[in-house]
Amino acid sequence: MDYNGVLVGLGNPGARYEGTRHNCGFALIDAFVDFGYRHGTVDEMNGGKFSCQLWRVRLPRLDGCWLAAKPQTFMNLSGQCVQPLLSWHKLKAADLVVAHDELDIPPGELRFKFGGGNAGHNGLKSITELLGTPDFYRLRMGIGRPPHKGDVTNWVLGRPQGEDAENLDHILPLALDVLFAFADKGLDSAVRLAGKTTRPRKPVRQTANAEASNNSPEASATPQNKDNT
């Protein structure tokens, strides 16, 4: 079967990471698949050979069929899912859209781009290394930076609260609109639409350490030989 593209949302597997900032890519896949069930056709596929959860989504707004994947590796091993997934389906890096959290974008805002650096994101780094190219599309979902330097790990692995959580929820339908704009009209349209997103309000943030202790026990603990950031 021919596919128009592949949407991969980055995150860490397991209940302990559900709802964390680092898993906003997973949240987008959930929203995309749910939209597909309501407005199109969705087939759940066997993604075991690619170490991912995998769906085939057909939507009129996509003018065809897309794959949607949630890697079940840890974040820094995301490429071990993406590279074989593309290879098996005879797709190129340029057919790939990766949705991921972005520290340098405020919560409630989006950016869309093709290629570029990884900005310290281990999931993007793994994908770039195993594909052998940075030339794929990125749907960047803003999570903002922590209020105190040095606690980035606790921040990305923490669960947002209050207005901060509302800001992150706010971008999910907007992110779908950006994806549909890209599928329908191409890169420039997606870039313009993403650039129009603004924070609905200034979030009041807890410290990352408080969030980690309140919402994600052991969230800062890195499993042996794994890197969840």
Swiss-Prot record:
Instruction: Return the annotated site residues (Stabilizes the basic form of H active site to accept a proton).
Output: 101
Compartments, as annotated in UniProt: Cytoplasm
Keyword tags: Cytoplasm, Hydrolase, RNA-binding, tRNA-binding
Alphabetically, the GO molecular function entries are: peptidyl-tRNA hydrolase activity; tRNA binding
Which residues of this protein are annotated with the site description Discriminates between blocked and unblocked aminoacyl-tRNA? 12
Q: Which InterPro entries match?
A: Pept_tRNA_hydro, Pept_tRNA_hydro_CS, Pept_tRNA_hydro_sf
Q: What class of enzyme is it?
A: hydrolase
Quick one: a GO biological-process term for this protein?
A: rescue of stalled ribosome
Which PROSITE patterns does the record cross-reference, listed alphabetically? PEPT_TRNA_HYDROL_1 (PS01195), PEPT_TRNA_HYDROL_2 (PS01196)
Q: Which PANTHER family does the annotation name?
A: PEPTIDYL-TRNA HYDROLASE
Q: What does this protein do?
A: Hydrolyzes ribosome-free peptidyl-tRNAs (with 1 or more amino acids incorporated), which drop off the ribosome during protein synthesis, or as a result of ribosome stalling.
- Which NCBIfam families did the record assign? pth
Q: Supply the name of the protein.
A: Peptidyl-tRNA hydrolase
The scientific name of the source species is: Desulfovibrio desulfuricans (strain ATCC 27774 / DSM 6949 / MB)
